[in-house]
């Protein structure tokens, strides 16, 4: 969440930033509540000072055996006033906190202004899309023809947007995960295997709740949610903690299954592995000092790109515009892999700097020096990578005229075979 003091001091700049994001939010009511809250605080403090003075006078009169009944009645009245004002103050603070939970992060100055994905800016490309001299098949057809992906049985046992991996398809998924985790560990990330169920507070901490509740799978009758990404449990590892400044930055990588309702995705990517209710993903999460976070974003993005380079998959990196960024992000790079059947690049990773937005919600701080006041860390995360989409990209980019798929060299030690089919 944003810093209330910053919003109060810079209302016009914050309102302009929200407009650039396309957020239809007026700060007027929030700022009015803030003015009322501050006035109440002053009034309550004044009444408490008066109560203390009256209490001292009552004690003096009782000691002198003088009548203090009128003052006692006055103190009760002051106490009632304080309670009423405290109750109002609590209601206002809860209202302000709730409103703040719906206000998105402010875009970094380097983020291009725009309203949709059409305004995103390409940063770089790697690799050249392959030219095929035979009809290109989509990954879902390749998977079914090789008997390694079963969409029909996935739908039978669960419903739409679920897939069963079989034989070398299951091994390929596992091999991709292991390559990603081993590579990131070699590049300095500490592996974490997190819970797949988290509580509501964890979802609030990373910004999924309350705004995106319809996209989450909640466990009925409990406080639990299935995680939409390992970002949630890994970021919340340090909720309500003050981190050792000497140990920053902290780099974690985590493999997890991810669960998304995809409430707003009706009719989009209905076939294949691109948009599933359950999918595997490797996540990279960083906790850094504020002054280093944008350097760390560049490194994180390069770490995600490195996996695609190992696999020989063409991709491009784009900077998301203000209107296309996620709710909690201050800046985001999307990495898009080339999918021949689409004739286009498709997202396979989002790498974001959230600055102190998540840390403020989750109360994750560090002490810059031993006697310094704690400050909020900056948090970053990125997919390193989405596993199902990586499998889809391998099947499509590495397909052969005879219907087989050549395994990228980096995966062969994990697969034990060089080719699927053929």
Curated annotation (Swiss-Prot):
Biological process according to GO: selenocysteine biosynthetic process; seryl-tRNA aminoacylation
Record keyword Aminoacyl-tRNA synthetase present: yes
InterPro entries, alphabetized: aa-tRNA-synt_IIb (IPR002314), aa-tRNA-synth_II (IPR006195), aa-tRNA-synth_II/BPL/LPL (IPR045864), Ser-tRNA-ligase_type_1 (IPR002317), Ser-tRNA-synth_1_N (IPR015866), SerRS_1_N_sf (IPR042103), SerRS_core (IPR033729), tRNA-bd_arm (IPR010978)
This enzyme's EC code(s): 6.1.1.11
Enzyme class, spelled out: ligase
Family, as annotated: Belongs to the class-II aminoacyl-tRNA synthetase family. Type-1 seryl-tRNA synthetase subfamily.
Protein name per UniProt: Serine--tRNA ligase
Species the sequence originates in: Heliobacterium modesticaldum (strain ATCC 51547 / Ice1)
């Amino acid at each position: 969440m944003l810093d209330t003091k910053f919003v109060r001091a810079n209302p016009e700049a914050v309102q302009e930033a929200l407009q650039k994001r396309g957020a239809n939010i007026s700060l007027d009511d929030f700022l009015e509540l803030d003015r009322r809250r501050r006035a109440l605080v002053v009034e309550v403090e004044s009444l408490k000072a008066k109560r203390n003075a009256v209490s001292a006078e009552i004690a003096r009169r009782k000691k002198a055996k003088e009548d203090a009944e009128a003052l006692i009645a006055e103190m009760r009245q002051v106490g009632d006033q304080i309670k009423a004002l405290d109750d109002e103050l609590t209601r206002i603070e809860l209202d302000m906190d709730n409103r703040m939970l719906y206000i998105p992060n402010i875009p970094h100055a380097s983020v291009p202004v725009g309203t949709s994905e059409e305004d995103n800016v390409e940063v770089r490309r790697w690799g050249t899309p392959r030219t095929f001299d035979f009809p290109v098949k989509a990954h879902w057809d390749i998977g079914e023809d090789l008997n390694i992906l079963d969409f029909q049985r996935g739908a039978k046992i669960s419903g739409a947007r679920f897939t069963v991996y079989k034989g070398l398809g299951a091994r390929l998924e596992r091999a991709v995960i292991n390559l990603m985790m081993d590579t990131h560990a070699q590049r300095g990330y500490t592996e974490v295997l997190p819970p797949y169920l988290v509580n509501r507070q964890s979802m609030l901490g990373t910004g999924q709740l309350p705004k995106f509740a319809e996209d989450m799978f909640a466990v009925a009758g409990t406080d639990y949610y299935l995680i939409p990404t390992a970002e949630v449990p890994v970021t919340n590892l340090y909720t309500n903690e003050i981190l050792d400044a000497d140990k920053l930055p902290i780099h974690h990588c985590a493999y997890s299954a991810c669960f998304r309702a995809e409430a707003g995705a009706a009719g989009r990517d209905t076939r294949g592995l691109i948009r599933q209710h359950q999918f595997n993903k490797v996540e990279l999460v960083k906790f850094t000092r504020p002054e280093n976070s944008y350097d760390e974003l560049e490194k994180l993005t390069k770490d995600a790109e490195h996996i695609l380079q190992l696999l020989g998959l063409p991709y491009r990196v784009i900077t998301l515009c203000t209107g296309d960024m996620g709710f909690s992000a201050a800046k985001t790079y999307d990495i898009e892999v080339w999918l021949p059947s689409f004739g286009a690049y498709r997202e396979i990773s989002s790498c974001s700097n959230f600055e102190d937005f998540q840390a403020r919600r989750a109360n994750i701080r560090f002490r810059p020096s031993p006697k310094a006041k704690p400050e909020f860390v900056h948090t970053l995360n990125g997919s390193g990578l989405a596993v199902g989409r990586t499998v889809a990209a391998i099947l499509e980019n590495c397909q052969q005229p005879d219907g087989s798929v050549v395994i990228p060299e980096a995966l062969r030690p994990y697969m034990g075979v060089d080719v699927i089919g053929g």
